[in-house]
């Protein structure tokens, strides 16, 4: 473990407000008002808005080496935006006031909610920080049965750590056997950790409890990467919807704890034995459902899906995606959903189905379409999504009439929203996720025209230490796929960057990437067309005519520039999506001069209809609004 000197330790202790702040020497010091200090202040000021906008968790960096500042902000998932923002603002103020020249500092603030703010001159993302920042037993000794307290406390912690191993946080209540008292507990990990390291950090806090806080009525243990807190009273409003785990009058003993562990294992073994004896039809259904271990609570009854879609009536059909059809469904309570029915004949169907459920069920971000659940029945595999009324982006962008609804403000907002969504997939989600099929048809629009990324059927997740991979099966949409993926099957986060670059150019120009008829009679793709404009002709010729002159010229030119940087032939020359986000939101960042992009061509021939269909690829339109009404009549 790296040893370091704690320069400043600030602790405020009360029953309503707990915080711990540490300014660290290990990374050195900076000169006040230096470039690093400025970057640090800009970084901290960006956290309150971005943390609340991106599901309560945000990582970023500002500046260039050696003055780059890395930062992280986090609130408990589900915290209302106002409380989260206030907590981050107060944490920032504490750091700026007390860590005047330390290049690294951490603060956990626990007031009306829990928040974490951290900055450094080095990248600490995904690193496990195990130094104890604070270990306090600031309440009185427990006066009743200590054995009961110990058993109940450890049982509660085991359950919460298990839940945090896939959610990064957990709150719980457990009643003592020998008194009316209840233990209220809360655990939280920094969401940049791997799930394995989250569990490891929390388990070490349990070990620390035994040496610092055994027998106390309450306490808190804080590390850079995680913390635990427990009390004999509810705190932070975390327990309003939680019922005590142990019923009144029921004892919990060592034998009971063992039973809790052993019985499910025995039942699982018995279930596996029965599972192997079932008919093939039942076997396949159970296999898929059992594989999706993280999403059991999301399962719908297949009959309920049939009823909601009028038995998949054609009038409810919204569109056709890469691996199946999409229908509109309406449940008896009036809730509207989009139902994706995977094709039975697709050789990729089952794999893609499980992949999508595994990935999407773990993702929570305002720029991603929310997966509500799934259903399986034999060969039938169903995904249920939130219903978005405004169709997909391509229905507006490439329609000569509807594109008029997309002024520059809306288009710029769509570009920024897509950027945030991909940054979350690549960097801020629990796994590094590569979409591999980003296109206008996979960007849905909500009622306010905010973008939401959909269709994770071909998505791939990476290990933390993995940067690229190779596939023998190239999937996606021609025109959006980068050269290294088409020719060699190599993909990485830079594959999505390429697709995003094409998408930016389509959004600005209102033109499909598939083919552009140039003035000299030749045919090229959109990337080639924009590259020619960049070198020889007015760049703003690209701007979609319906926007007229009502746009910010500098914003448009900068977005075109970023689009060209994203479609560079060499993946190493493309920026990361995090860098793209900073390029869009910070105009002081100087952009590099782009080199010729990948797939630049110019050929004189007439378009081939078949090739044109291949170039466009399948498009999912999950929000198509059908004007025909159908009444489902159920038999009496």
Swiss-Prot record:
Extracellular side: 21-254
Domain Gnk2-homologous: start-end pairs: 21-124, 130-235
Catalytic activity: L-seryl-[protein] + ATP = O-phospho-L-seryl-[protein] + ADP + H(+); L-threonyl-[protein] + ATP = O-phospho-L-threonyl-[protein] + ADP + H(+)
Major localization class: membrane
Catalytic residues as annotated in Swiss-Prot or TrEMBL: 437
Listed InterPro entries: GNK2, GNK2_sf, Kinase-like_dom_sf, Prot_kinase_dom, Protein_kinase_ATP_BS, Ser-Thr/Tyr_kinase_cat_dom, Ser/Thr_kinase_AS
Subcellular location: Membrane
Disulphide connectivity of cysteines: none
Any one GO molecular-function label of the UniProt entry: protein serine kinase activity
Name of the protein in its database record: Cysteine-rich receptor-like protein kinase 24
GO biological process: defense response to bacterium; plant-type hypersensitive response; signal transduction
Signal peptide residue numbers: 1-20
Residue ranges constituting the Protein kinase domain according to the UniProt record: 312-585
Ranges in the topological domain labelled Cytoplasmic: 276-636
Lineage: Eukaryota, Viridiplantae, Streptophyta, Embryophyta, Tracheophyta
């Amino acid at each position: 473990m790296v040893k370091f000197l704690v320069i400043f330790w600030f602790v405020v202790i009360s029953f309503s407000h707990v915080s711990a702040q540490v300014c660290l020497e290990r990374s050195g010091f900076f000169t006040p008002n230096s470039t690093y200090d400025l970057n640090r202040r800009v970084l901290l000021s960006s956290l309150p808005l971005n943390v609340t906008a991106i599901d309560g968790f945000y990582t970023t960096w500002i500046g260039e080496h050696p003055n780059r500042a890395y930062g992280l902000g986090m609130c408990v998932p589900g915290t209302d935006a106002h409380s989260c923002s206030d907590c981050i603002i107060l944490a920032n103020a504490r750091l700026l006031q007390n860590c005047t020249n330390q290049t690294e500092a951490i603060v956990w603030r626990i007031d009306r909610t829990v928040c974490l703010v951290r900055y450094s001159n080095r990248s600490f993302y995904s690193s496990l920080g195990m130094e104890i920042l604070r270990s306090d037993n600031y309440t009185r000794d427990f006066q009743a049965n200590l054995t009961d307290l110990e058993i109940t406390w450890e049982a509660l912690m085991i359950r919460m750590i298990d839940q945090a191993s896939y959610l990064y946080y957990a709150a719980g209540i457990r009643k003592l056997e020998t008194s009316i008292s209840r233990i209220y507990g809360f655990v939280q990990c920094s969401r940049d950790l791997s799930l394995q390291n989250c569990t490891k950090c929390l388990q070490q806090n349990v070990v620390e409890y035994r040496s610092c806080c055994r027998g106390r009525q309450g306490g808190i243990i804080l590390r850079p990467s995680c913390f635990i807190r427990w009390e004999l009273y509810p705190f932070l409003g975390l327990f309003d919807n939680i019922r005590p785990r142990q019923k009144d009058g029921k004892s919990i003993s060592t034998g009971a704890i063992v039973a809790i562990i052993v019985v499910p294992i025995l039942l699982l073994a018995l279930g596996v034995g029965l599972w192997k004896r079932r008919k093939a039809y039942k076997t396949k259904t159970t296999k898929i459902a059992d594989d999706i271990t993280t999403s059991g609570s999301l399962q719908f009854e297949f009959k309920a899906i049939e009823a909601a879609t009028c038995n998949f009536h054609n009038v409810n059909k919204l569109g056709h995606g890469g691996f199946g059809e999409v229908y509109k469904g309406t449940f008896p309570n009036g809730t509207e959903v989009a139902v994706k029915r995977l094709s039975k004949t697709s050789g990729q169907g089952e794999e893609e189905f499980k992949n999508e459920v595994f990935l999407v069920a773990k993702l929570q971000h305002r720029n991603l379409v929310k997966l509500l659940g799934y259903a399986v029945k034999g060969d039938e595999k169903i995904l249920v999504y939130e219903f978005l009324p405004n169709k997909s982006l391509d229905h507006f962008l490439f329609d000569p009439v509807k594109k008029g609804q997309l002024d520059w403000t809306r288009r710029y907002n769509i570009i920024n929203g897509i950027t945030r969504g991909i940054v979350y997939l690549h960097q801020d989600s629990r796994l590094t996720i590569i979409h591999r099929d980003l296109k206008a048809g996979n960007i849905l629009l909500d009622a306010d025209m905010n973008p939401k990324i959909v269709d994770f059927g071909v998505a791939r997740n990476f290990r933390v230490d993995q940067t690229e991979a190779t596939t023998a099966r190239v999937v996606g949409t021609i025109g959006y796929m980068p050269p290294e993926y088409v020719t060699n099957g190599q993909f990485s986060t830079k594959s999505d960057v390429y697709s995003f670059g094409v998408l930016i150019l389509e959004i600005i120009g209102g033109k499909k990437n598939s083919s552009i008829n140039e003035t000299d009679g030749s045919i090229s793709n959109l990337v080639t067309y924009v590259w020619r404009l960049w070198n020889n002709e007015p760049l703003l010729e690209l701007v979609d005519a319906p926007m007229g002159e009502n746009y910010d010229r500098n914003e448009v030119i900068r977005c075109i520039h970023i689009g060209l940087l994203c479609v560079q032939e060499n993946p190493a020359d493309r920026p990361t999506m995090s860098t793209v986000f900073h390029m869009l939101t910070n105009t002081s960042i100087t952009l590099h001069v782009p080199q010729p992009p990948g797939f630049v061509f110019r050929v004189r021939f007439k378009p081939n209809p078949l090739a044109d269909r291949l170039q466009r690829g399948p498009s999912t339109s999950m929000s198509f609004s059908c004007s025909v009404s159908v009444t489902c009549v159920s038999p009496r």
